[in-house]
Amino acid sequence: MYKGILLLLSAEFCFTLSTVFGKFAMADEGMTGIEVSFFRFFLGAIAAAAYMLWKRVSFRPNNITYVALRGVSNTAAVLLFFTGVQHSTVTNANMLNLTYPVFVFLLAPFINRERSRGRYFIFLLLALAGVYLIILPDFSSVNPGDLCALLSGLVAGFAICFLREARKFDSSEVILFYLMLPGCLINLMVMAPGFSIPSGTGLAYSLCSGAIAVAGQALLTVGYRYIEAARGSIVSGSRILFAGIMGVSIFSDPLTLQIVLGGALILVSLVGVSGIARKFFPPNGM
């Protein structure tokens, strides 16, 4: 289990660091979030294809519907997330994106036909309270970037539910490849009118952001082999801490009491919906 925890912590550190390099490309070189995310999908598609060729894994999916839904929904989530990073802060974007397990809990009964416990609505309310504190830290205005980051969490909830269904028919390698390939194509279509290949530091930052995110995805995939999903979702919440530290120390992100409380409430909701709480507080007592 400790190996799984270490791998997942490393994965979440990579995902946060990826957003830092992406923010550098946006702030210093004027790139958009969509342009930065293209390199993540591009490098990921190359890495996934190379691995499948090396392992001689067939590129033909068994259930194209769920594989495609997973790929398209994940692409939309990533585009929204990096748009959030562009217009908001690294801290806020990561915190709001991490609401996705709560949306999985809401969507699972409809997509996966899994029952959701009624008591989990308490954790939903906690998450919504946390979102409110982050999006409205001064209780006056809403940052469009924060809304994009929150929407990325909602769409990621759909993506996770589709992933659960896709795994019933296809391997992780096939799902990952068809996650990255649509991302490349959709990104190209969205940014084609005015896109030009960046040069210098813009290209370096984008490549670093993409490569580190791909490394994080690999660590995440391997890590879940050594830890159960419920515990893993709690470890994934460490990205809130990483984002807060990096955002404040590197970009001087504002970290008000309201934002800290909002992040804490979201983290508590992650603990709740993961099912960990049931192990320590069973409904029928000890």
Predicted ranges, named:
Residues M52, R56, F81-T83, Y100-I122, ...:
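C-terminal transmembrane-helix exit sites in multi-pass transporters
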